[in-house]
């Protein structure tokens, strides 16, 4: 969005209080765009001058429409979602209310208020569900809904289809039609990222990161927050008439374009904070079985004790099964060019916030967790073998 071309353009960002939404808002603000951040929670950072924050819930249509009062919004970036990882992934009702119901409300508000462009932040998971994918592209079919191992991925798939199907629908105000597209990012990282990296660092500091798993040759992808910001701005531009609406109705995979083994990707973070990278490697099936048992335990006990699962089945797939995608369509149609980044910024951020190994800080914890890892392996093996033993008796 060139500030000389559209200095008075206004955009609204759902999920604008989160890590990526806030970063996108700041980037657009620097380009001279009027930015409205819409979220159920305030940003952790100070809101820069020129950016407006509105507290609201995408599950409430009136909240959304109130955010449009008195302004002509040219583009909505619909980022808000729920249930991406950890225990959130197991709250099916809330996931559906936000990811599907919230998206319905956003689409309805865009039509009523005459918003001409909508960029939806989707996920790799609308296509991936545990199957190996090498250099896949946008021609791949959606994963059938019943094959998704988690409700987040299932609802994101439903929502993406709704967004792309809404492309070309008539606007009730101002004439014209709604142009939509969907970006499917890999896992997001960057300095100050609030979801994945803090959880990983917490596991490292507690001595839980004692093993890796799966094929050491398996490859996955990540996307730096600033590359994802670039992609969203380009996608919004590509929905305009002067770009021939080239992105209208289209999905795009977005990543850094550098497939890498999941655990090797995080090695600089582990070692950069002064910890030893684990040498023990466990089978993927063993960890998947453990994740399944953990989910079942949470299903039974979650209402009494909403504990944080060590891993979910989807997280095991995402980290241990090869899946990466071509960026050719995003390059050709959006002009997307991934810039090179690594985890060094994140390492420095964590160090600046008091993280890092201190001499002797982990030794006793590590002995305890080594014992728990052995117990985990024995438990899963017993649960796995018990039915066979009973049948053979």
UniProtKB/Swiss-Prot annotation:
It comes from the Eukaryota. GO terms for molecular function: oxidoreductase activity, acting on the CH-OH group of donors, NAD or NADP as acceptor. Keywords: Membrane, NAD, Oxidoreductase, Transmembrane, Transmembrane helix. The chain crosses the membrane at residues 282-302, 371-391. It is found in: Membrane. GO terms for biological process: steroid biosynthetic process. NAD(+) binds at residue 156. The active site is at 152 (proton acceptor). Pfam families: 3Beta_HSD. It is a multi-pass membrane protein. One of its GO terms (cellular component) is membrane. Coiled coil: none annotated. Signal peptide: none annotated. Its EC number is 1.1.1.-. Belongs to the 3-beta-HSD family. This is Short-chain dehydrogenase/reductase family 42E member 1. It comes from Bos taurus (Bovine).
């Amino acid at each position: 969005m060139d500030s000389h071309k559209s200095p008075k353009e206004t955009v609204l960002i759902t999920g604008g209080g989160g890590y990526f939404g806030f970063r996108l808002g700041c980037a657009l603000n620097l380009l001279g765009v009027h930015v409205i951040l819409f979220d159920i929670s305030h940003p952790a950072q100070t809101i820069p001058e020129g950016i407006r924050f509105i507290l609201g819930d995408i599950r409430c249509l009136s909240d959304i429409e109130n955010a449009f009062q008195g302004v002509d919004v040219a583009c909505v970036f619909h980022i808000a979602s729920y249930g991406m990882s950890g225990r959130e992934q197991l709250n099916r009702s809330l996931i559906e209310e936000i990811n599907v119901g919230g998206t319905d409300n956003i689409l309805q508000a865009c039509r009523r208020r005459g918003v001409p462009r909508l960029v939806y932040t989707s996920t790799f998971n609308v296509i991936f569900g545990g199957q190996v994918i090498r250099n896949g592209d946008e021609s791949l079919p959606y994963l059938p809904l019943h094959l998704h191992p988690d409700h987040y991925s299932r609802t994101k798939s439903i929502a993406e289809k709704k967004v792309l199907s809404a492309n070309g629908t008539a606007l009730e105000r101002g004439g014209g039609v709604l142009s939509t597209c969907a970006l499917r990012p890999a896992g997001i990282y960057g300095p100050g990222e609030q979801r994945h990296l803090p959880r990983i660092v917490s596991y490292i500091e507690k001595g839980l990161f004692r093993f890796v798993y799966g094929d050491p040759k398996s490859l996955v992808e990540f996307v730096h927050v600033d590359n994802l910001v670039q992609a969203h701005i380009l996608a919004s531009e590509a929905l305009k008439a002067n770009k021939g609406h080239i992105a209208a109705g289209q999905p795009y995979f977005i990543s850094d374009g550098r497939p890498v083994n999941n655990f090797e990707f995080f090695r600089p973070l582990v070692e950069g904070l002064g910890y030893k990278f684990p040498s023990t490697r466990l089978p993927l099936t063993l960890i998947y079985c453990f994740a399944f048992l953990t989910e079942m335990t949470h299903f039974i006990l979650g209402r009494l004790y909403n504990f944080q699962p060590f891993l979910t089945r989807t997280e095991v797939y995402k980290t241990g099964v090869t899946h990466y995608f071509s960026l050719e369509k995003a390059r050709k149609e959006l002009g997307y060019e991934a810039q090179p980044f690594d985890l060094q910024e994140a390492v420095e951020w964590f160090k600046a916030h008091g993280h890092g190994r201190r001499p002797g800080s982990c030794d006793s914890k590590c002995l305890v967790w080594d014992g728990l890892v052995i117990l985990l392996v024995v438990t899963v093996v017993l649960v796995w073998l018990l039915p066979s033993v009973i049948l053979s008796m």
